[in-house]
């Protein structure tokens, strides 16, 4: 996407696990470098439950219940 294209966005939502969240940081750094005023919100969702800042991720409980 070009900088002109990104100007239509005010917010970006990223849904996923720890790898996705690391990617969101890279996107955030690029927005910052380009001085784009776009908010990024990370929504944790994974089966591994390995995202450090939360107790349980969406998807984890479903995986546990399905395995039982």
Curated annotation (Swiss-Prot):
Which keywords are on file for this protein? Allosteric enzyme, ATP-binding, Cytoplasm, Glycolysis, Kinase, Magnesium, Metal-binding, Nucleotide-binding, Transferase
Residues the record lists as binding ATP: 17-20
MF (Gene Ontology): 6-phosphofructokinase activity; ATP binding; metal ion binding
Pfam families annotated for this entry?
PFK
Gene Ontology cellular component annotations, sorted alphabetically: cytoplasm
Main location as per UniProt: cytoplasm
Which purpose does this protein serve, as stated in its record?
Catalyzes the phosphorylation of D-fructose 6-phosphate to fructose 1,6-bisphosphate by ATP, the first committing step of glycolysis.
**Name listed for the protein in its UniProt record:** ATP-dependent 6-phosphofructokinase
Per the UniProt entry, what species is this protein from, by scientific name? Triticum aestivum
Gene behind the chain: PFK
């Amino acid at each position: 996407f070009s900088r002109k294209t990104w100007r239509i966005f005010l917010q970006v939502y990223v849904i996923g696990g720890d790898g996705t969240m690391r990617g969101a940081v890279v996107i955030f750094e690029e927005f910052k470098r380009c001085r784009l005023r776009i908010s990024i919100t990370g929504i944790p969702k994974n089966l591994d439950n390995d995202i450090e800042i939360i107790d349980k991720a969406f998807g984890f409980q479903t995986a546990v219940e399905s395995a039982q």
